C-alpha cells in the first residue's frame, strides 16, 4: 500500500508544483 502511495505522490507533486509555480 505505502509504496503505491509514494509512487502516486511522486507523479502528482511535480505537476502540482508546476501548476502553482508556473515553471513547467
Swiss-Prot record:
Keywords: Amphibian defense peptide, Antibiotic, Antimicrobial, Cytolysis, Disulfide bond, Fungicide, Hemolysis, Secreted. GO terms for biological process: defense response to bacterium; defense response to fungus; killing of cells of another organism. One of its GO terms (cellular component) is extracellular region. Expressed by the skin glands. Disulfide bonds join 18-24. It is found in: Secreted. InterPro entries: Antimicrobial_frog_1. It comes from the Eukaryota. Pfam families: Antimicrobial_1. Belongs to the frog skin active peptide (FSAP) family. Brevinin subfamily. Has antibacterial activity against E.coli and S.aureus strains. Has antifungal activity against C.albicans. Has hemolytic activity against rabbit erythrocytes. This is Brevinin-1JDa.
